[in-house]
Amino acid sequence: MAQTTFSGPVKSLAGFISAGVSNSVTTAAGKTLTVANDAGKQIYYTSTATATFTLPTVNASSPSDPTDPNQSNNFGATFEFVLSTTVTGSFIVKVNSSNDTVVGTAIIGEGTTSMAVFSTATASDTITLNGTTTGGVGGANVKATVVGANRYKVEVVSGATGALATPFSATV
């Protein structure tokens, strides 16, 4: 199969493998994410300060032509975050719309002595890693994928310190 190189964002209706220097974005500040600019990229957070990353509103509209690459449905859009260092403020990932929620789990480990798995509550819409009890140690990973109407599936893996606590809440 021939190989094609694109310099701008590509929207695939059947998935693809992305690799290259533009697939990882380094930032020291939070932002409101978009599907066109941020989906499918690894966001490498390099600051210890508080930052908020706001996920795009889930768009579940059914296209009249499911093969149209310009459809607005964003099912399958994935946003991945990696912390380069332990945060001293709060690293926050939240939904943009009060209609959207997150479902998933967080695996938080404290040194070699304890580990906990936290599940989202029905109304969860925010992930907060505080650098201590809810995670946020360097190397932490947060992944959010649009999986259905008003729903993101989330996965959190992080080290922590102190008495472990859930990173999930309802704040939007």
Where are these regions (language model features)?
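Short solvent-exposed loop/turn micro-motifs enriched in small/polar/acidic residues
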Residues: 3, 135-138
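Exposed extracellular interaction/assembly regions and N-terminal maturation sites
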Residues: 3-113, 149-172
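A gly/proline- and charged-residue-enriched helix-loop-helix capping module
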Residues: 107-126
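Short, P/G- and charge-enriched loop/turn segments at secondary-structure junctions
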Residues: 126-132
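Extracellular disulfide-bonded cysteine-rich modules/repeats
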Residues: 138-146
